[in-house]
Structure formats: structure tokens, C-alpha cells
Amino acid sequence: MTASNDGLASGLSFDWARPSVILGLVTLGAHLVANGNYDFFRDELYFIVCGQHRAWGYVDQPPLVPLLAAGSYALGGGALLAFRLLPALAFAATVALTAEFVRVIGGGRFAQWLAGLCALLAPVFLIEGVLFSTDTFQALTWLGLAWVLVRLEQTGDERLWLVFGLITGFSLETKYAIAFFLVALAIGLLATPQRKSLLRPWVYLGALVAAVMVLPNVLWQHAHGWPFLELGRAAVNGKNAVLSPFDYFAQQFLQAGPLGMVVVLCGLYAGIVRPRLMTARALAIAWLVLFLIFVTQHGKPYYLAPIYPALLAFGAQRIEQWLGKAVARGAALVSVVVLGILMAPLVLPILPVDTFIRYQQMIGGTPPSTGERLKIGALPQYYADMFGWREMAAKVAEVYRSLPAEDRMRAVFFGNNYGEAAAIDIYGRGLGLPPAISGHNNYYLWGPRGHDGSVIIIIGGDAGHYAELFASYRVAGRIDSSYAMPYETDQPIYVLYGIKAPLESSWPEVKHYE
């Protein structure tokens, strides 16, 4: 039996020499080295706080990631490396299953190595393997759905739609973005002979499984006025950068890596031109649909990334057919590795920060865009937002302790965004600070927490605006961090006294969903 036929016929069996096993272990090892460097990212702090306020949903995400983040933080004793173990494991599994998926669709060892290496070294996945975020499980679950569709096509076992439903339900509990993939995938399936399977009862049983899993979150969103839809409108109408179709496509070469994107394009070609499996065509069409959706709706460039592991697999299989000579295959693998290693420090925190800045300048590297309208400093946003939070909390604590005892009893920190508020809630506990308040995203729902607004500590903002809203104010300190985002550094710390409108009644005015 050939390697190709073996890949189509067999299931998973463990073999230490398999590319999937080796690449998965290398991925995990690299992230165990890197993930403890720098510090907690803005969103990670926020997810921990959200998870400590357990609920069936949140303004800006489903419940599972905050729950896992808070659990990881507690079990790891607040250690950064322990906290980021789950992202590392999820990414290692994604890389391993990308290589294994190649085997399942009939690819040989070269194709397995090529697809796995491209996934391992894709900039977008390297950083997602670091940060605990709503994207942590996206590539893994989207690949899981593609895997199920392939096995459905190969075996005809319609009970696999139940597995499809389980994966979908899990993914929806981590991020709603898979809904776009499901729509795009349905359009892709309708364009293939597989459309007949969409009428089978097992499809609807699988959908029922997913619906039951996500129902509590849907009910929570309904009870709170569908805040996630309001958040989505804010992203479309201003938060996210507007990219032309050409610029959005060009960004994909930074997300997947230049050579990785070439393999993805080969996967699209393989799906459109005489595909061996109709799932490949459905995925190619799904990519086109997703591209149109995200360009027109101002989606961030990395929103397309979760579909890439499956396309890498189909692309690598097609390249394997084209490159018959060992020399050509070896050159392809070496090229992917060399270029990937050169780009890795741009998205993997393996260098001391000053060394990273010099390295970035030396190679002229452009980190992948986060897709937001933000002024960037010396570091890309995903690194910059790991710095300055502890120092900020310490400065706020100094201001808080300098207040007279009577004022301290009434004082509260108001965060202009959830990053500031979460940093106070996480780092301020040990410094004697009370829980923070904010109007940003889920902090708005937690309200003023019993504070009347008579003494508020706040960072930055418009002093003239404060003069209108409060009886008096003063500058009590300053925050400064060389590496933080520009709008989070070199800012005054104000103490505001005597709010003119009661905080409880004016709270709706601070609502800020973004």
C-alpha cells in the first residue's frame, strides 16, 4: 500500500517519527521557551478579570476563554508561563494536526513536512500560540471542521455530523467568528456534490448539538440587549482600519508568511482545479467568501487565518505532485525554515526587548497588522501591550496612598479602557487598591460598584472636560513606560473631586463598547 493510500485509509496511530509528532513537539518546546517572556498582555488581564466574574456571556466574547483564563491564572499561581500553557498546547496541536491532515487527504511525508512547517512558522499562529485570547482555539477548531468534512466524504459516515456539531459548539463558546466560516462553508458545499449531504437528518442533529451548547450564551446576549452586535457595529464603523481588497490580500502574506501564503494559494488552486476531494473545493470557495465578507465589513487581516491550516494541507499535497526531485523538495523546506526563523522574533518574544527593536530595524521586518487604527511606538501593538501595566498600577497606588484617609475611603480608579481597569484589578490587589471601574465593554455592566464619584483617580484625558464635570481636580502623578503603547505612556494621573451629577444616574453616559 502506498503512503498516499495509507493516508486515505487509515486513522490516527502514534509514531514518534511522524512529521506531525516531531513538529508538534518542536512547536510546544519553542513556546515553552518564549511564552514566559515580557508580561501579561492587555486582553489577558481583562480575560482573567472577566473569568473571575463568571457569567454565561460577556459584552465582547463568549464565556469559555475568560473561564479558562481565570482558571489558568489561579492554577498557575499567576505565573506567566503557566498561564500561557493552554495557547502553547492549542498551537502545537494545530501544527501537528495540520501535518496529520495532509496524511489523511493522501499526502506523503514531504507534503506533511511542508504544511506543518508552514503552520509552525506562520507569524499569525506564532503570536496566537503566545497570547491567551479568543483566537487561541480558532485555527484548531476550523481545521477540525475541515477534517470532519474530509472523513465524511471518504467514509460516508453521517454520524460525523455530530462531531461537527460538537466542534462548532465549542468554537462558538470561544469566539463567534466561526459563524462566518459556517456561512462561507455552506456556500462552498452548495457548489459541490456534497450539497446533498446538507439535507440529511444527521446534519440537523449536529446543528442541534451546537445550538444546545451555545444556548445559555445566546440567552445572556438577549437578556443584555445583544451587546456583541453593538460592539460589532463599532468595529465596522471606526475602530478597525479600512483596507482595500489589494491591501487586505497583501496583509495575508504577513499573516501566513510569504512562502506559507504561496502554499495557501496552491491550496486554493488545488480546490478549484480538478480537486481529488470536493472538500478542497468547498474550502477554496469558503476562502473567497470570507475574503469578501472581511474586506467589505472591515474585518482585521488575521480573521482569515483560521482557514489556512486546511488550505496549507491541500496546497502542500499539490506541490508534492509538482516537485518530484529530492533537491527541489529539500530546497522548498529549507526556504520555509530559513525565512520563518528570520521572521519569528517579530511575533515570538524570544529576544530581550531592546535587542528585538534593533533586530526589527536591522531586517526591516514589518510585523503583521492587528487591523486597528492605533498609533504604534517602538514595538508592535501585540508586544507593546505587554508592558507598563505593573508600573501603572504602582503609580496609581502611590497616588491612592497619598490621599487623606477620608478620601481614600471614597476613592476609586476609573479606567479609560479595560486594559487600565484590569491592570488595577490584577496588580492593584496586592497594593491595597479597591476594584476599578470603567465604562469599557464588560466593565460597564459591572457598574460603579457602589462608588458615588466623590473621589476618582484617572489617567490622562481632557482637563477642561474634568473641570465641567467635577468641582475640582489636580494632577497627582504621571505614568511613563518606554515600551507601552503611546496612548498609555507619558500621561498625567488626575484626582477628580466632587462629581456634579451622581455617578449612579450618569453611568449610562460612560458606556463605551468597542
Residue ranges and their predicted role:
Residues 148-169, 200, 204, 208, ...:
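Short hydrophobic alpha-helices at membrane interfaces in multi-pass membrane enzymes
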Residues 3-4, 8-21, 98-121, 140:
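Transmembrane-helix signature of polytopic, membrane-embedded enzymes
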Residues 85-106, 144, 148:
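Transmembrane-helix motifs of polytopic, lipid-linked glycan transferases
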Residues 321-360:
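Signature aromatic-anchored transmembrane alpha helix within multi-pass, membrane-resident enzymes
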Residues 124, 130-138:
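Short acidic/glycine- and proline-prone juxtamembrane loop motifs at membrane-interface regions
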Residues 24, 115-123, 168, 172, ...:
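Short helix- or helix-capping micro-motifs
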Residues 170, 181-280, 294, 344-355, ...:
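Transmembrane-lumen/periplasm boundary regions of multi-pass, lipid-linked membrane glycan transferases
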Residues 13, 103-106, 145-161, 267-275:
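Membrane-interface transmembrane helices that cradle and orient dolichyl/undecaprenyl
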